[in-house]
């Protein structure tokens, strides 16, 4: 098993892994009732994730884990937030097939407020936007290896102090706590009439033993 920088050839598998991993994610499910056609929520989520993968591949840091020649996990990291236009030109415009511009803007604002919880309370200079493991590899230590070993080393080698992130599921929160991450806060966010919890975390940078 190895972690490497993603390439454009990885985009389809990265998009699939993230979409499958986040299909039932409470934060994203808040979108569903307000889409033009709620039954097209999976396609909308795929468009969101394809946009993120393309934007991070082009502008920031996109990593994949390979096992036996297959991509089995994805991590998207940044030390400077990806801007609106970077997202737009990398597929953000596709979201308007599924949602009004107002809904897209509101969802983006809620995401920014969620991230800001970690930013305000943490002491980190890198941010983990997405972490997702292929469903066939869950429970085999891939996520823990990334969170506790690979990503702290990645940040440390770039002179960083720590990385921050948020999650909206209790099971993820337990996973991160057990993986040595520091819980910063638990809050609730709202998109129109929908709400979900947000756990904010940070993890200190640490070089792997050579």
In which residue ranges do the predicted regions lie?
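A short beta-loop-alpha structural element at the N-terminal edge
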Residues: 2-29
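Conserved beta-hairpin
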Residues: 59-75
């Amino acid at each position: 098993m190895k972690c490497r920088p993603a390439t454009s050839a990885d985009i389809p598998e990265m998009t699939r892994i993230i979409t499958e991993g986040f299909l039932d994610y409470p934060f994203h499910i808040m979108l569903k009732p307000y889409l033009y056609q709620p039954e097209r929520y999976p396609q909308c989520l795929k468009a969101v994730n394809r946009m993120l993968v393309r934007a991070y591949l082009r502008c920031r840091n996109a990593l994949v884990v390979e096992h036996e020649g297959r991509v089995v996990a994805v991590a998207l990291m940044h030390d400077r937030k990806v801007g609106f236009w970077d997202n737009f030109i990398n597929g953000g415009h596709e979201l308007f097939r599924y949602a009004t511009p107002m809904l897209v803007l509101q969802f983006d604002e809620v995401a920014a407020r969620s991230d800001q919880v970690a930013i305000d309370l943490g002491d980190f200079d890198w941010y983990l936007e997405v972490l997702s493991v292929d469903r066939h590899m869950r429970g085999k230590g891939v996520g823990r290896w990334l969170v506790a070993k690979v990503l702290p080393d990645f940040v440390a080698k770039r002179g960083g102090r720590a990385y921050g992130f948020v999650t909206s599921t209790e099971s993820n929160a337990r996973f991160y706590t057990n993986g040595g991450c520091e819980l910063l806060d638990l809050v609730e966010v709202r998109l129109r009439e929908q709400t979900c919890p947000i756990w904010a975390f940070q993890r200190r940078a640490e070089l792997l033993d050579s």
